[in-house]
Amino acid sequence: MKILRRFWVCVSILIFSLTVQAQSLPNESLKEQKVYTSLKEALQNPEQVYRLKLKLPRKCDSIPEEVFQLTNLQELRLTGCHLNVINRNIGKLKLLRFLHLNRNNLVRLPEEFTQLTQLVLLDISRNPLMELPESMGNMKSLEIIDAWDTQLFVLPESIAQLAETLKVIDLRQVPLKDSEHVAMQQLLPKTSIPYSYYCDCNNDR
C-alpha cells in the first residue's frame, strides 16, 4: 500500500512539474530569459530555451527540424534567413507568442501555422506573401500582424473571429485598392489597418 501511495505521489509531482513547465512566462519574465543564437547550444537544454534568434545559411530554405524540439519556445526570430517555406511542424511550438519571419521569401503559410493559438505578434513583413491560412480565426491570442511590404490583398473570412482581439494589421507599402481595404475593415471593424500605397490595379485582379 505504501509503495502504491508513493507511486501516485511521484506521478502527481511529475504531472505538476510538466504543467508548470508548459506554462507561458509573463512578458517581464520572458524578457529576462537568455536569447539563444546557437541551435547547437539550445539543444543542450531544450526545455530551458524560451527565446531563440537564428541566422541561417543560404542553402537552408526552411526552419531546421531541430527547432521543433524546443517545445517551451515563446519567442522565435528568423529575420532575413532566406526561408522559402514554413515547415508543417511549426504547430508543435504550442507556447510560441512572438514570431518574427520578416525579410524572407515566403509566399504562403501552412494551415498548421494556425495551431499557434498562443501567438500574440506575427511579423511577416517584407515577404512576397499573398495569403494567410484559411483558419486564421483559430489564433485567438493574436493582437498584431505586421504585413508591411507584402502582397496581402485579401484576408481569410475566418479572421473576423478575431475582431475583438486583433489590434493592428500593418499593410503599409501593400498595393491595395481602396475597395480591398474597405473589405478588410468590414471584416475587422475594431482593428487598425494602416496602408499607404494605393494601387489602381483593376486590370490586374
Positions of predicted regions on the chain:
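General helical secondary-structure elements
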Residues: M1-K2, L93
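Short hydrophobic/aromatic-rich motifs at helix boundaries and adjacent loops
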Residues: V35-Y36, L152-L155
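Hydrophobic anchor residues at the C-terminal helix/turn of individual leucine-rich repeat
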Residues: L43, E66-Q69, N89-K92, L106, ...
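Low-complexity, compositionally biased segments
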Residues: E75, I90-K92, V107, R126, ...
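Per-repeat beta-strand-to-loop junction in leucine-rich repeat
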Residues: K55-P57, T79-G80, N102-R103, E112, ...
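Hydrophobic packing within well-folded, soluble alpha/beta domains
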Residues: L73-L76, I90, L96-L101, L106-L109, ...
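The feature captures the LRR N-terminal capping module
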Residues: K2-F7, I13, L18-T79, N84-R88, ...
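Canonical position 11/12 of the leucine-rich repeat
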Residues: R58-D61, H82-N84, N105-R108, P128-E131, ...
